[in-house]
Swiss-Prot record:
Functional pathway: Pyrimidine metabolism; CTP biosynthesis via de novo pathway; UDP from UMP (UMPK route): step 1/1
EC number assigned by the record: 2.7.4.22
Activity regulation statement: Allosterically activated by GTP. Inhibited by UTP.
Subcellular location: Cytoplasm
Class of the enzyme per the UniProt entry, highest EC level: transferase
Chain positions covered by the region annotation Involved in allosteric activation by GTP: 20-25
UniProt-recorded name of the protein: Uridylate kinase
Species the sequence originates in: Limosilactobacillus reuteri (Lactobacillus reuteri)
Amino acid sequence: MSDIKYNRVILKLSGEALAGEKGFGINPPVLKDVAKELKEVHELGVQIAIVVGGGNMWRGVTGAELGMERAQADYIGMLATIMNALSLQDALESLDVPTRVQTSIEMRQIAEPYIRRKAIRHLEKDRIVIFAGGTGSPYFSTDTTAALRAAEINADAILMGKNGVDGVYNADPNKDASAVKFDHLTHMDLIEKNLHVMDTTASSLSMDNHIPLVVFNLNTPGNIMKVVKGQEVGTTIEGD
């Protein structure tokens, strides 16, 4: 593993990334491609934990905007992340990759409850661990979950796989042709420039625990491998 920069990582996988161009639900070919890439990285000996979002199924903020109580809407979103986690687990295990799903909301019939020491032990036994259910509390995003779990398991970095976006820009590249991509930023840059890579709570948690972030395009084959090897892909965020 001499050519590996990050030996233990959290991959933040958005729900939208699993939907692909469909924009809603799960796109089976996309799910299969992600699983294949994870298998290749896993075979290098990299310890992988994954935090999945649920935006391809439901967004708590959207539910609240429609008049639903925010906490209730967020709980629905947590259930959406669990559906995505089980789908990803199935895709990985179809490729003979050992996995465990841990949920922040107990549902022992289908997944383990989140236990930090057990999660670390699974990683040490070369199992991919998929964290689902967010933090288990409303008002917290899955980005915050990624930062929290990364700190808890002592991850070397958070890999933020984006759907069709190859890094961090000073404006939305899909709307502004003059948008400029950043290769390197600090955590404080994210907060001061209001760059919307992750919410402020997640950014602060990552900064306080000195956890690097790498934002990259998940849709480009081989990018996860390039990131764990420390190659120049996307935008790297580190330092205060």
